[in-house]
Amino acid sequence: MFISSKRLRERNTFFREDGTPLQYTLVNTKDWCKNEYEVINQLRMNTRNSFQRYDVIILINGLPIVQIELKDHGISPRRAMQQIIDYKNDVGNGYTNSLLCFMQLFVVSNQSRTYYFTNNNNQHFNFNADEQFLPVYQWADENNNKISNLEDFSELFLAKCKLGKMISRYMVLVASEQKLLIMRPYQIYAVNAIMNCITENRGNGYIWHTTGSGKTLTSFKASTLLKDNEDIEKCMFVVDRKDLDKQTREEFNKFQDGCVEENTNTDSLVERMLSDDYADKIIVTTIQKLGIALDPKNRNNYYEDLLSLKDKRIVFIFDECHRSQFGENHKAIKEFFPKAQLFGFTGTPIFEENATYTQITGEQAQYKTTKDVFQKQLHSYTITNAIDDNNVLRFHVDYFKPEESDCLQSEAHRKRAIAETIIKKHKAVTSDYRFNALFATSSINDAIDYYNILKTIIQNGEDLNIACVFSPPAEGNKDIMQIQEDLEQERKDNEIEPDKKKKALETIIKDYNKQYDTNYSISEFDAYYQDLQQRIKNQKYSNSDYARKNKIDIVIVVDMLLTGFDSKYLNTLYVDKNLKHHGLIQAFSRTNRILNDTKPYGNILDFRGQQEAVDTAIALFSGEKDPEQARQIWLVESAEVINKKYKQAISELRDFMSSYNLDFKPSEVVNLKGDEAKAGFINCFKEVQRYKTQLSQYTDFEQPLIVSEAQADYGLSNELSEDELSAFRCVYLDLAHELKLKRDNNKKEYTDPIIENLDFEFVLFSSALIDYDYIMNIIAQYTSSPSKIKLTKEQLISLVASNANLIDERNDIIAYIESLEGVNGRTEQEIKEGYNVFKNEKFAKELMNIADRHKLSVASLQSFVKNIVDRKIFDGDKLSELVAPLDLGWKDRTKKETAIMTDLIPLLKRMAEGQKISGLSAYE
């Protein structure tokens, strides 16, 4: 797919019979309206075992470029997405062995809801317990109003010239990831606004695009389009920190290999600014290097060297246009380059209302507003728009005001109470430790205090990994001084008792080294800081190569990480720090990156009762005239409202069971007859689970992982005990597995639409806490002293059976649990070893049965399977060798290979223990 996408756009050479070359492109990307466009309906193509039918395909110059799959009203377009992925997984599909490999875009619609997304490799789409998707978009107008109706979408997106421009200009090939990207509507409008401003030479401008909206891709596309503008001498992309310089260069070069080179120092920056090389037309640099280059007092005379560029048209694009350093350099840039045009990106503009700040000296100072610096706003895409588009999450804010008695206590007592509350709430807000959290404190001293308090609490039994980061005293170190330029509080704090803070940071890093088997020191602070950031991002569950002991639960910060840091696995911010205006929005926005349904919102636990500051920030940055309407978009519903919906979903499930004359019991679900009834249960119960998942992250309610019926739901609802809910989850997963197999194995032309349109949403039934190690530990406790364990053998089995992340291995674990006799005093390690022996014996028996069923040599089959499991790669040639002794004709051999793999795939997945086997999807 990726190679075909490159070939579609690049210039190719064809040699005529007389040896003369003819250069051509498959698609005209310069003058896209001159391409030939055609539409075909209901194309049918055979695969190895069946066939596929595509609703609508749009051809450009005879090549299939856009596929459109349509569903009836009321059926989720997600089913059309899944159908496309099923098509791509089918053995011998057209996307791998026909011109369909040139497919660029998919459009799915049920007439009233229309989405589009790029064609990509299968690993980027997953409809199971890890459920993560590539970006799926809705088109929108310039004011960010969504265009959902299919007819309106077709007119605005699929018209010949508009589609041609989208394919030619607004798609990006990421070579390092072998991935195809398409720009979002607001990114396209922003690029066009910048380009028009430059073409017409209409001065400066700024783009207000919220944090997390992908401004790097927007600026990259603007820069690359400027590269071909002969009137522009240079395009300078300016960032304000060394780490962002590296990060931005890597992002730009990811989008286009070799796009920008590193400026190791100001010498190399000036050299590239003076270069006529086409490769040096786009330059990424820091504001600090640029400031030095334009300083007439600098002893290296860079100022004199650059005078030849003084009257050239140079475009400056600023990564974050209201950083403290920007104001100091703005005047120098405008004075030196009078013909320059300046464009800024910001997620939180400076308005009159938030322009005042306190200097370190204690005096009041004034930012220039974003409009003062950049003249006019060219486009906006606010956090309100992003939340409404599901590009970022809403916020769930809990305010914890101190009790009157606490106010009378010492500061140490208050901090201890806050730390204990954090420990108490952390499991719930992070969805059983699936996610991690930042803890924002008001000073370095507070960060140190909280670190020590939390460490003390953890030593008394809590299983949490705590880290802390703040900048050390600079002591003349230029790298640290640069890091601290935007860390106002940390810079101020380090002026008082610097040795004490340095010693505390050394202890923190030493603890970090011990926890994570690293070897950092305060002299390598940047390396420590980078490792900590990566560890937060590596929280991904489940990841068998990244054990829980390597993960971070809570990182205590002062200023660091509260701006510019993104991780989809960070979902909570604890706050004991005064925040307001853009600082508040930036800090809150660390929590709201989209993942899947297990992360419904970003959690904010504020221990300073700053509701007024939150309301003010929402009103200021929402872009809405009605602050109350903005609040409803930004903030999630209360626990009481979600609980009401949860109870309503249970009531609807009860009514559904009653409509089939069945008691409201998990054991009765097996008596549902027919696919329609089973599908009805799937749709009803997953809504119960959806609201349960949301409620589990509300700190207003505390829910243990396992509760008895007497403890049922801690007041959430009296309608389902935790045991009953777990039992319903078990039957849901059994039924979902049954219907999914039926759908996957149904290769007939007319698939039952009731099953075809089901969306199982397995992600709602997975737990980050309940993994292999957790279960083995519980079994060890049970076999050692069942009288002391909180759950029965039956509850333990139910626990395993009701979690989707154990779905491939749950039958083996359950069989092992049932095989265990009472008290035998085994350790956890002995339990694991015993389970492995049990499992391997079970695997061996199953392999013998498969070999017998297909008349294969047991030894040959064992060798074939071992090769796959060891290498995590399926080799089709090895399968042919396995079947060769049967001496079958081509058609019978193909059938036999498919039958063998149908039997083997479930076993191979269990043996792979959650790791992906490359190439196996062809038989799934």
Which sequence ranges carry the predicted segments?
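Signature of the SF2 helicase/ATPase Hel1-core->accessory helical subdomain module
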Residues: 77-80, 86-87, 118-119, 125-128, ...
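Short basic/glycine-enriched coil/helix segment immediately N-terminal to the Walker B
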Residues: 60, 199-203, 275-279, 296-314, ...
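Conserved two-lobed SF2 helicase motor
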Residues: 279-293, 548-563
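Catalytic cores and motor modules of nucleic-acid processing enzymes
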Residues: 203, 228, 233, 246, ...
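Conserved helicase motor
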Residues: 43, 213, 239-242, 263-272, ...
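Conserved C-terminal RecA-like helicase domain
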Residues: 281, 407-557
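ATP-dependent helicase/translocase motor core
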Residues: 1-234, 243, 247-259, 278-279, ...
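Inter-Walker segment of RecA-like/P-loop motor cores
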Residues: 254-299
